[in-house]
Amino acid sequence: MKYELVVGLEVHCQLNTNSKAFCGCSALFGKPANTNVCPVCLALPGALPVLNRRVVEDAVKIGLATGCSVASHSILARKNYFYPDLPKGYQISQYEEPICSEGMIRIDVGEGQRDIRLIRIHIEEDAGKSIHDIGEDTYIDVNRSGVPLLEIVSYPDMRTAKEASAYLQKVRQIVKYLGISDGNMEEGSLRCDANVSIRPYGSEEYGTRTEIKNMNSFKNVEKAIEFEANRHSEIIDAGGAIVQETRLWDADKGETRSMRGKEFAHDYRYFPDPDLVPVLVDDDMLERMRLELPEFPEDRAARFVSEFAIPAYDAAVLTVDREVADYFEETVRVSGDAKVASNWVMGEVMRTLKEKYLDIAEFGISSLRLGELIRLIGAGTISNTIAKQVFEIMMSDEAAAEVIVTREGLAQVSDFGAIDMVLQEVLDANPGQLADYRAGKTKLFGFFVGQCMARMKGKGNPAIVNDLLQKKLAG
């Protein structure tokens, strides 16, 4: 494409607080429609909001994590607009004085890294939800109204759709590491609007932008941005002009469609909410939140490399998700073997999670049990092949690995006499292959090992099998 793509993202992160932003109603997802509602949610006369302290603390945490300037004094404002799922007629947000500003998020792109600047992070409450798939009518569920959000607004620093996706994934990783959100895009815990424009390469002036909504996965974010960039290019090449508007992404059709003309800030008539006092963040809160920050992925990966002597690639994979990193570290503590633990978590564990669509918290084998299984391998009680059989049994059996090995008769055979006898049977049964091996076809060594292991049902000690076989074949 002869144009440069320019993208900025507005990410809405739903906080995992127990109660809503300005009242005591439950903020839990999935409750029956219109059951988590009170006079404050609906702004009924006389109902006064009170800011949830946890919302401020979470905002400070992500501000510190992204290098933002955290304001000691910020203002909650009313964002006025009319929509069926906004019963109050306004949304409590922040405008002129946000709680966090001027931060940065570093993303990995290809061979290097890029820093994406943040304009602001501000507190906001969510709106309700319109439901269009029940008969011919539209229904309103206001359970979500008042659920706390943090809006993370970037500068238009992204130049490809992949960079935008990488940025969004990094935001998700940060909020999950902080423990302030589950980052679930399918449930709407993490939503993003993309501001997209194009300009000729070398130009410093921004083109007219469109805002894209309704993207519920990282892949859809990429597809929507790429489609919109191509649409802009085609319009400009045909001599047309881009209309500044909000567009919806239709994942089924793979295209965007016009939703409404793009609003400007003055259209919302922001003004300080007269029912809410300013948000004050003192030095004590800043220091307390700083002490609560976790070890972030980059630092944790570096520690894994130095402390456990595992490859940098393994460390990077294991620290993408905080819960997986915790699981791995506990497995190492129990097993005493970081490299084997790394192989198992990156291999069997992650494969199972992917196949069964599970999070690590839902996984049926605890880090303690996996560590005990790895310890049996290290002790020579079972081979790695048998360990995989035990692993599959452990998925549906809560017994310890050692109990399963004993019960199923899976202990490794290390008796030299027993292994020697089986090897002799294999050689006697395959005289042709034996002659070929001794004639120079040494690749048949693996054939003999396989035959021996098959006769011993995988329980032969591999080191002893290999050693004895080499001696027999040389005789």
From Swiss-Prot:
GO terms for biological process: glutaminyl-tRNAGln biosynthesis via transamidation; translation. One of its GO terms (molecular function) is asparaginyl-tRNA synthase (glutamine-hydrolyzing) activity. Gene3D superfamilies: 1.10.10.410, GatB domain, N-terminal subdomain. The keyword Cell membrane does not apply. Disulfide bonds: none annotated. It catalyses: L-glutamyl-tRNA(Gln) + L-glutamine + ATP + H2O = L-glutaminyl-tRNA(Gln) + L-glutamate + ADP + phosphate + H(+); L-aspartyl-tRNA(Asn) + L-glutamine + ATP + H2O = L-asparaginyl-tRNA(Asn) + L-glutamate + ADP + phosphate + 2 H(+). InterPro entries: Asn/Gln-tRNA_amidoTrfase_suB/E, Asn/Gln-tRNA_Trfase_suB/E_cat, Asn/Gln_amidotransferase, Asn/Gln_tRNA_amidoTrase-B-like, GatB, GatB_C_1, GatB_Yqey_C_2, Gln-tRNA_amidoTrfase_suB_CS. Keywords: ATP-binding, Ligase, Nucleotide-binding, Protein biosynthesis. Its EC number is 6.3.5.-. Coiled coil: none annotated. PROSITE patterns: GATB. Allows the formation of correctly charged Asn-tRNA(Asn) or Gln-tRNA(Gln) through the transamidation of misacylated Asp-tRNA(Asn) or Glu-tRNA(Gln) in organisms which lack either or both of asparaginyl-tRNA or glutaminyl-tRNA synthetases. The reaction takes place in the presence of glutamine and ATP through an activated phospho-Asp-tRNA(Asn) or phospho-Glu-tRNA(Gln). PANTHER family: GLUTAMYL-TRNA GLN AMIDOTRANSFERASE SUBUNIT B MITOCHONDRIAL AND PROKARYOTIC PET112-RELATED, GLUTAMYL-TRNA(GLN) AMIDOTRANSFERASE SUBUNIT B, MITOCHONDRIAL. Belongs to the GatB/GatE family. GatB subfamily. Heterotrimer of A, B and C subunits. This is Aspartyl/glutamyl-tRNA(Asn/Gln) amidotransferase subunit B. The lineage of its organism: Bacteria, Pseudomonadati, Chlorobiota, Chlorobiia, Chlorobiales.
